[in-house]
Amino acid sequence: MHETDMTKALIMTIQDWFDQQVEKPQITKIHLLVGQFTCVEPVSLQFAFEVQTKQTFLNGAELVIKDVPLVAYCHTCQTEYSPEIGLQYSCPTCRSPMDDIRSGRELKIDRIEHHQCTPA
């Protein structure tokens, strides 16, 4: 389950950003782009995030995962296509092997929603 390690890396990245803020914001949502070709299970990622953020600066923050489809480009046919995730990734028209992936390998933070905490 590599989602646990990915979640640790995600938290460390957000921690670095958080530590650079002069006034520490309350993080409410983290929007993440996850490509289909990363083989990341969104449910496992959500679970790992919930477990690892309890009693931290991210406690209560929501992880919003946007699935990015796998899109490849066939240089022979000069067209984009969306291969099915599985064993066969060749062009559906000419059967050339997939060698130019246009999207689907993303695993990145799209944006962080937050608001400034008001002093008590």
Curated annotation (Swiss-Prot):
The keyword Nucleotide-binding does not apply. Ni(2+) binds at residues 2-3, 41. Disruption phenotype: Disruption of the gene has no effect on hydrogenase activity or urease activity. Keywords: Metal-binding, Nickel, Zinc. Gene3D superfamilies: 3.30.2320.80. Involved in the maturation of the nickel-dependent guanidine hydrolase GdmH. Required for nickel insertion into the metal center of GdmH. Seems to be required only for GdmH activation and not for activity. Belongs to the HypA/HybF family. This is Guanidine hydrolase-activating protein A. The lineage of its organism: Bacteria, Bacillati, Cyanobacteriota, Cyanophyceae, Synechococcales.
